[in-house]
Amino acid sequence: AEYTTSRELLEGMAELAHEYKQPVYLHLAETKKEVEECKMRYGMSPVQFLDSIGLFDYGGGGFHGVWMDETDRNICREKKVSIVTNPSSNAKLASGIADLPALKKAGINLAIGTDGPASNNALDMFREMYLAAVLPKLKYEDAAVMDAADILKMATTGGALAMGLPE
């Protein structure tokens, strides 16, 4: 994550990504505090900062993606950065609800993850799928905002694409 890694190390990661032409995966825009502190440090969001140092030039993935604005979503779409939602972790840590409908509308590949055992007591993909389906419904007050096909795609081909695997 941007907030746990020095600028120098992140720039080194970007150099390696360029050298080996490889995507980078990291926690991204998980909490409001993370985004606010990054804006204080660099004058831009974590997505914008990491893009500015070339970290996303070969695509990759951002875990969580809860606090992203339209500019962030556009960068992720253009740079082919998948967003991997971790709804149980985000609920347990009160990080917020990822705006999956806005991310989908922006044309970003979406996947579902569990995060780690310290922030998720179950590591149960079926529970994650359920929460990925129902939390946006609460956020939007719309029972149809994310349907079963969206969630199944996120849990299968969306995950494969996020990892760079063919569908």
Question: Can you describe what each PLM-predicted range is?
Answer:
Residues A1-S82, A94-L110, R127:
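Histidine/acidic residue-rich metal-binding segments in metalloenzymes
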Residues E30, P87-A91, G116-A118:
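Short, acidic/turn-prone active-site loops that include or flank metal/cofactor-
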Residues E37, I75, S89, G96, ...:
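A generic "cationic amphipathic patch" detector
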Residues M40-Y42, S89, L131:
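A short linear-motif detector with a strong N-terminal bias
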Residues S52-G59, P101-E167:
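His/Asp/Glu-enriched, well-ordered alpha-helical/loop segment
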Residues G65, N86, A132-V134:
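Generic beta-structure capping elements
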Residues W67-V84, I151-E167:
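Short N-terminal secondary-structure initiator segments
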